[in-house]
From Swiss-Prot:
GO terms for biological process: amino acid transmembrane transport; L-alanine transport; L-proline import across plasma membrane; L-tryptophan transmembrane transport; proline transport; tryptophan transport. Belongs to the amino acid/polyamine transporter 2 family. Expressed in retinal pigmented epithelial cells. It comes from Homo sapiens (Human). It is found in: Lysosome membrane. Uniporter that mediates the transport of neutral amino acids like L-tryptophan, proline and alanine. The transport activity is sodium ions-independent, electroneutral and therefore functions via facilitated diffusion. It comes from the Eukaryota. Optimum pH is 7.4 (for proline transport). This is Neutral amino acid uniporter 4. The modification N-acetylmethionine is found at M1. One of its GO terms (molecular function) is L-alanine transmembrane transporter activity.
Length: 504
């Protein structure tokens, strides 16, 4: 009986480890021992061995769907109602569907190119940066072939920027929501105090938003000291449940409190559209989980079907919540729809707590990418006894950088748009079509494929340039927000109890 239980327990442990491993983004195994890639070509690297799974060890179709949903649903979803405001009630949803279709198509492109290059270079799997590097090697242009290693570095750079940007967004999100919950609790105490002692009313006070960010800093540092994602399995499961419950409560609120939407603008001003683009691309930037999931799927031939179904669900969720959220709150919509929920009802206050818990746990998962790209190259230069101390120091430093970024730009909507325009557009829209051109230019040249890919990449480049320009301009010269009873000011008032500062 005991012998029979042991394999079952081992199998359960293996499945748990797989569930966490597929959440690892596309990290490429790098050689820090001075050997070349050619010397390693016939050897399976540790990461490659990890992906050589038989049918019993791989993940199922349903598990693949679940991981696709986990990899795409986060703070970007809650910021989409404001994105619809920046585009218009008609143009916004149409554009959101369009960007979703292009993003999914680029995911398919990346998978197809990875398969071709794996066969060409006899590799079991390839990460994102290696796919770009090998695509440059097989291109017909010698100048790109000589700079193939440069392509790998560019992708790694944007992966680091993107993921650290996500982490900065998470810190702003945590601070905004916890601040609102805390102030709602204090206001309820003030109301009770005033009702019992009307002759001595209590003064409303508000703590600076950046103080909340600093309060989260030590807890986040301790969280990222957990180096193995499998050790976060329980927390990750609870985070997924809490975020799912929060979304259900948000949906029922916006559906039950829908005012007349006829006065909403069909199309917003052109200057706000780049902000919409950045937020939308930020939300759809789940390309980092595509190849790991495909590599670990039992029936990898069914992955395109899983990708279409999963991203179809994600797109439907995005469009419905974004549209309903904007229709519900109109121009009062904020950087996260959770901030528009009533502060005097604890059911909706609990939504902010539950979703904040989910985002807090997700921080460590997103942080895994820059940590695995940056840390090995630095710690390899230290003696063994100093490596762990050095690693913890680097982790603390990187977390502090994300916190500093959040403090410098404490506006959730602007941070999301900036990260989406700068790095997410590069990884999700610009690089995949260019990689397809390079990969198949010698095999089956097709002028329509080239035109299609150039159009997608051009869209990404335009969004990158305009989105970056508009968000930087908004950071330097923020649009004034008029609050009842206060004069119009071009400066942000982070101490505003109404939380209108830092949010549009």
């Amino acid at each position: 009986m005991e012998a029979a239980a042991t394999p079952a327990a081992a199998g359960a442990a293996r499945r748990e480890e797989l569930d966490m491993d597929v959440m690892r983004p596309l990290i490429n195994e790098q050689n820090f021992d001075g050997t070349s890639d050619e010397e390693h070509e016939q050897e399976l690297l540790p990461v490659q061995k990890h992906y050589q799974l038989d049918d019993q060890e791989g993940i199922s179709f349903v598990q693949t769907l679940m991981h696709l949903l986990k990899g795409n649903i986060g703070t970007g979803l809650l910021g989409l109602p404001l994105a619809i405001k920046n585009a218009g009630i008609v143009l916004g949803p149409i554009s959101l569907v369009f960007i979703g279709i292009i993003s999914v198509h680029c995911m398919h492109i990346l998978v197809r190119c990875s398969h071709f290059l794996c066969l060409r270079f006899k590799k079991s799997t390839l990460g994102y940066s290696d796919t770009v590097s090998f695509a440059m090697e097989v291109s017909p242009w010698s100048c790109l072939q000589k700079q193939a290693a440069w392509g790998r570095s560019v992708v790694d750079f944007f992966l680091v920027i993107t993921q650290l940007g996500f982490c900065s967004v998470y810190i702003v999100f945590l601070a905004e929501n916890v601040k609102q919950v805390h102030e709602g609790f204090l206001e309820s105490k003030v109301f009770i105090s005033n009702s019992t002692n009307s002759s001595n009313p209590c003064e409303r006070r508000s703590v600076d938003l950046r103080i909340y960010m600093l309060c989260f800093l030590p807890f986040i540092i301790l969280l990222v000291f957990i180096r193995e994602l499998k050790n976060l399995f329980v927390l990750s499961f609870l985070a997924n449940v809490s975020m799912a419950v929060s979304l259900v409560i948000i949906y029922q609120y916006v559906v039950r409190n829908m005012p007349d939407p006829h006065n909403l603008p069909i199309v917003a001003g052109w200057k706000k559209y780049p902000l919409f683009f950045g937020t939308a691309v930020f939300a759809f930037e789940g390309i980092g989980v595509v190849l790991p999931l495909e590599n670990q799927m039992k029936e990898s031939k069914r992955f395109p079907q899983a990708l279409n179904i999963g991203m179809g669900i994600v797109t439907t969720l995005y469009v419905t919540l974004a549209t309903l959220g904007y229709m519900c709150f109109h121009d009062e919509i904020k950087g996260s729809i959770t901030l528009n929920l009533p502060q005097d009802v604890w059911l909706y206050q609990s939504v902010k707590i539950l979703y904040s818990f989910g985002i807090f746990v997700t921080y460590s998962i997103q942080f895994y990418v820059p940590a695995e790209i940056i840390i090995p190259g630095i710690t390899s230069k230290f003696h063994t006894k100093w490596k762990q101390i050095c690693e913890f120091g680097i982790r603390s430093f990187l977390v502090s950088i994300t916190c500093a970024g959040a403090i410098l730009i404490p506006r959730l909507d602007i941070v999301i748009s900036f990260v989406g325009a700068v790095s997410s557009s590069t990884l999700a829209l610009i690089l995949p079509p260019l990689v397809e051109i390079l990969t198949f230019s010698k095999e089956h040249y097709n002028i329509w494929m080239v035109l299609k890919n150039i159009s997608i990449a051009f869209t990404g480049v335009v969004g990158f340039l305009l989105g970056t320009y508009i968000t930087v301009e908004e950071i330097i010269y923020p649009t004034p927000k008029v609050v009842a009873g206060t004069p119009q000011s071009p400066f942000l008032n982070l101490n505003s109890t109404c939380l209108t500062s830092g949010l549009k």
